[in-house]
């Protein structure tokens, strides 16, 4: 590469910071600039990037903060010596579901920016509402209940929009805004998602929403490829569905569409080329699957404090417990997502109990946990026909399935299909080392059932690869059990892109959009250039004949166990 080759920027506008990451055509990172909202901003009384109103469970961010941040990140890149004139394309990733409310004067302000002044100075008056609801906001229970009931139940809402109603989703948030602040809503000319807000600043006029991020609203009918008219009507109330449709704008199907050239402001202030193209910005989760690139039927498991499971799949099989989005770049594929509240904490509870029993007390070492887990046979079965031990371990209330915090232990006999809630035969805490990891992985396998294909060679349907990210991905014993349960004909891999996944995915999206040949998919172009040895390491085998099938039987018992616990909990209320 000559040092004059094209460059591309991927932005990541998250809850606590804005990051700008620059790559070249070969996907090599050449610059990264960050603006930490708490540390680097001035004039906002935020904490961890947000403001809260606990009385109403509201969590929101001042939109002007993000204006300050964009100038801050670009200043940072300038100080690092970035030659802005080489930047050919820009895309971004935004925290999902958040909404920005533009006033009637927004487009005229965006078009007439003076490059000698900051964005914040000139655009603070461009918004009909100064705040954007954050994904942590929980103020919309009433609205969620209405959304869930409106098409006949949460199943029907998930079938249409990919998800049941959630507090953070944009539709319920707009409904609450329209009722609580009708005058603000009336004066709102356009509504952006956080991702399309970012693209709008760069373009100089309101950018359309992205085909994947629009699926996080409970308003977009995924199969029909259009807004659901009934849900728009519910959301808009007395203002009418047509008015809301105008506020939201059209949604282009091509995730790599060239929306337009960069706003003159950035050409004059930073030295961008006037030919720099702005591409659709997507949501943070869709951007994450672009950082790999994740191929159809590959699975990505984030083993952090909570557990997140992401998969690219050609199958659309929505369920109230899961999320489906359009794939951000590839028509015919969907992004499947599962979010759990319990993850690392539940595993640490068992680890600590084991260390305490063995006398290593306050140690945070995983050595004893790992040793015991690997010595325990799958499902704790002492013999081939013996009972399987399984349980649910939730230190905090769970959403998948929707139950209170607690622990439940069962034995399951696959031969007679009998399930018994009992602690008999459980050697606590030792048996729980394997049981906690199995419980978490069996839930993933249960809910991704039917989304995978056979990788060939007569193998049963399973992911081609399982990628692990987050703190838990460092643990090879957990990776081994994950592979035994989830499969992975090609193995289990640790993925390490630091905390840059969203920004990388956005930057790769820009490279693909500008450099693709006609009809060339993202997976093809990026797959050819991605140097996997820099980012991934194989840490465990995946599919093991016999063991994978045994866990297939365990999934049946696991599903019954969840249903029984849900029934018991419903009876308690």
From Swiss-Prot:
Main location per the UniProt record: cytoplasm
Keywords: ATP-binding, Carbohydrate metabolism, Cytoplasm, Kinase, Nucleotide-binding, Transferase, Xylose metabolism
UniProt cross-references to InterPro entries, sorted A to Z: ATPase_NBD, D-XK_euk, FGGY_C, FGGY_N
One Pfam family it belongs to: FGGY_N
Catalytic activity: D-xylulose + ATP = D-xylulose 5-phosphate + ADP + H(+)
Enzyme kind, highest EC tier: transferase
PANTHER family: SUGAR KINASE, XYLULOSE KINASE
Protein name, entry field: Probable D-xylulose kinase A
